[in-house]
A protein has these predicted regions:
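A short core secondary-structure module
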Residues: 153-197
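Short Gly/Pro-enriched turn/cap motifs at secondary-structure boundaries
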Residues: 89, 116, 131-134, 158-161, ...
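Structural signature of FAD isoalloxazine-binding scaffolds in flavoprotein oxidoreductases
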Residues: 65-75, 135-139, 218-221
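A short, Trp-centered hydrophobic/proline-enriched beta-strand micro-motif
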Residues: 119-127
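Short glycine/proline-enriched turns and hinge-like loops at secondary-structure junctions
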Residues: 66-67, 135-137, 161-166, 179-182, ...
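A short, charged helix-loop
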Residues: 212-238
Length: 391
């Protein structure tokens, strides 16, 4: 096992390679992708070819065998180029493929997981319903046994990648028992008769990360059940800490881009005979932005390392869930503050479509709800503090 210093050095070299890719191939396209709201097919395939989708998966299934902290470096750097592309990559490399890896058959891994990691198939994950977002207990999608497997009926909404997905993991009830105990996960091929993509959702930000409703009235084979009946919420819950820290890493990349652009603009823009960055009000804004970013960065990578220690069984995991929630809450709200201040530093141009700062402002709103809303996370963290009698 590499020493901490060696691991850090390897990670920084990886960061530089991702950053170079982003500067060379992502940034030149970011504005057009946002403006036209199209799926970035060429860049998606490039991410697969470069092995980025398989970072967290073992080499035995076509992955790279990297740790979670390294994956967060990837999400962080990619989001600095395009949060839309980073959101697509997060779905592909984490939620969309995780359950096929953990619970799929060898045949399913060959048919779905390996091509997805290579960027040849698009994956997604479908839990949210029109009447059930964070409240999974209100889920209505139903899976009923048939002689050949399962019949799934229902609808989902806010499904990332759905318009272009080749397969998806779907949450559905296997009985009429209310609450969380009857929810299970199923693998659905997008070519299955009775599976249809519904209304596209026109979004404020992350516009090239295509999102839509889906409708299910389809039959899937018996082995489409991923994990046991009634174990869906438990299995999703096991991934939530990674999802939340990953979302915080996305916020870091967007925050850094907005902060660096603002510092550059403040050095170049003149007002009253000197760069606006030399005026105290602008200096104060940059100081607050940098402080927010620094705190978010330290907390995010600390949480990522905790998850890695838990995976190595060198951490009890007692605080990982709460810490992941706190980090997601702080980093995404810090990002929202940073991009808001960035638009103010740009003055009237912060309201103009010709500068990318307006895209940062719009994209940041996605981070506030993905992985759990700020309101939900405050309830979770506050409840944990009360339960423990403090911190």
């Amino acid at each position: 096992m590499a020493s901490s210093a060696e691991a850090a050095e390897t990670r920084e070299a990886f960061r530089e390679s991702v950053r170079a890719f982003v500067e060379r191939e992502v940034l030149p396209q970011a504005e057009d992708l946002d403006r036209h709201g199209v799926f970035p097919e060429r860049l998606f395939k490039r991410l697969g070819q470069l092995g980025y989708f398989g970072l967290r998966y073992p080499e035995a299934v076509g992955g790279q065998g990297a740790d979670f902290t390294t994956a967060c470096v990837f999400y962080d750097e990619l989001a600095a180029g395009s949060l839309s592309l980073a959101a697509i990559a997060a779905m592909q490399s984490l939620m969309g493929t995780h359950f096929v890896f953990r619970f799929g058959t060898d045949e399913q891994r060959e048919r779905y997981l390996r091509p997805a990691l290579r960027g040849e198939k698009v994956a997604t994950f479908a839990l949210t319903e029109p009447g059930a977002g964070s409240d999974l207990g209100a889920m209505r999608t139903r899976a009923r046994r048939t002689p050949n497997g399962w019949r799934i009926t229902g609808e989902k909404t806010w499904i990332t990648n759905a318009p272009v997905a080749d397969f998806l993991t779907v949450g559905a009830r296997t009985s009429d028992e209310p609450g969380l105990a009857s929810i299970a996960l199923f693998l659905v091929d997008a070519s299955t008769p009775g599976y249809t993509v519904g209304r596209p959702i026109e979004k404020l930000g992350t516009r090239s990360s295509l999102t839509s409703e889906i409708h299910l009235d389809c039959e899937v084979p018996a082995d489409a059940l991923l994990g046991g009946e009634g174990e869906g919420v438990k299995n999703v819950g096991g991934l939530l800490s990674e999802i939340r820290v990953m979302t915080a890493a996305l916020a870091l990349g967007l925050s850094r881009r907005a902060l660096n652009d603002s510092a550059r603009y403040a050095s170049e823009r003149q007002a009253f005979g000197k760069p606006i960055g030399e005026h105290q009000q602008i200096t104060a804004k940059l100081a607050e932005m940098a402080t927010d970013y620094h705190h978010a960065r330290v907390a995010t990578y600390d949480a990522a390392e905790r998850i890695d220690r838990l995976a190595q069984r060198s951490d009890s995991g007692e605080n990982v869930t709460a810490v992941a929630s706190m980090v997601k809450l702080f980093a995404t709200e810090a990002c929202a503050r940073i991009v808001d201040e960035a638009t103010r530093i740009y003055g009237s141009y912060g309201f103009a479509m010709e500068y990318p700062v307006q895209r940062y402002f719009r994209d940041a709103r996605f981070l506030l709800s993905g992985g759990g809303t700020s309101e939900l996370l405050r309830n979770l963290v506050g409840g944990t503090v009360l339960k423990r009698g403090g911190v």
